[in-house]
């Protein structure tokens, strides 16, 4: 009797266990299928630009499963994509492939190989109806500005060196200290204010430190006066003064399309047309669920142990669940962005200019820069009887330029192209408009404080979150810097700890216009960052060189 009762109890326990397990499976799936207990992916990566795809490729090569979510339904590459229109290709923003990091240079070669071309570099500045070589050539500038204006520029420069603005905070103060007030007004003020839509007094000196710190008057004079010698090693070429650069045969998007295919071949997913609407963090498992809206508004969920985000920081903070503190939300809403659009004009080949691009320092036209895509790569233009120009206009999303009809913008571009003497409006046979929201994170007086607040909130509330790239970090990174942040983030994931400080990439502002190709090693950026209680940002303590 006792043994029979024991048997009944065991059968009852087994039945209850079966019912509970079945119920759990119906509600939550098997334990191994539960995204919070066993994420399907090592990382969910938001954005298929240079940062997102570099991280995906690095992790995939190490056998890790990843999924990349890209909002664009057609192109990968982000701002580094190539847009095609009737066989003509447009580089959104212009991308010279030249890096201080040897590893980045090698990675480009690994991805594209023989499809990387070596192209001549040529840029000019348009000022008062005259074209000046860029970087400036002193003797040319002397002859074109005139003796009197040149003398005033020299006096202004000497005065700035003798009495510099102490502790320059704004872009204007920084540039005046380096070049003098007169050269600032001639060659910096108009174009910079077009780009940012704000006074140079309101732009942080950080922008100047990143973009032009290596471009000094002395360097320009030395480059103009000394005979040029072809360097034995490409590593020794200073980027500001380079004569050539590498470029994908069909534009920068060719690089990232090839990279996406490599990720897929290694077992990763790269999904287009997925707009992320929520990023949910589970503190118990330290895992992430990312919700994206796909075709026809259908919501999909993607699960991963880590989240790598290159989406705009403002957007990420608003989408994180559980909700971040109000201080972080307010700081995120205070971050600003500058948008731009490219008017692509196809015109008959008559008096084509040979430069890669020309900066338009003329307040009488709205265009900021004009690109000649045939000078980037002849294969960007399918018909040799035509040329293709890209006119760049800087604006804010929703303003008058942004909302103009495409036909009106094309007419404006043709008119202004003729106005600056780069082509005849009558020669324009076709055109298109490409709009790029959030192209540039704005460096205003308060951006560092806001980024610091956000970083502290994310560090306190969100483990396994990695910010990479230009908009992901609200940091004006060039393409190669975005790639380096992604490589370091991927290596932190592989190491299981934050060994590398992605925030130290480009922190000193030395690289963007003063780097030497391939001179640094990416892997040397050790990370030991701690919050600085006396400031609104982190204080990185680094060791080694940075890529």
Regions found by a protein language model. Give the residues of each.
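C-terminal segments that line or cap access tunnels to active or ligand-binding sites in enzymes
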Residues: 294, 304-306, 310-484, 491-504
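Glycine-rich FAD pyrophosphate-binding loop
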Residues: 60-82
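Active-site/ligand-binding neighborhood in enzyme catalytic cores
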Residues: 54, 152-155, 159-281, 285-288, ...
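N-terminal Rossmann-like FAD-binding beta1-loop-alpha1 element of flavoenzymes
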Residues: 41-67
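Active-site-proximal substrate-binding core of FAD-dependent oxidoreductases
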Residues: 494-546
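Conserved Rossmann-like nucleotide-cofactor binding loop
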Residues: 51, 74, 314
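Dinucleotide-binding Rossmann-like beta1-alpha1 core, especially the glycine-rich loop
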Residues: 86-163
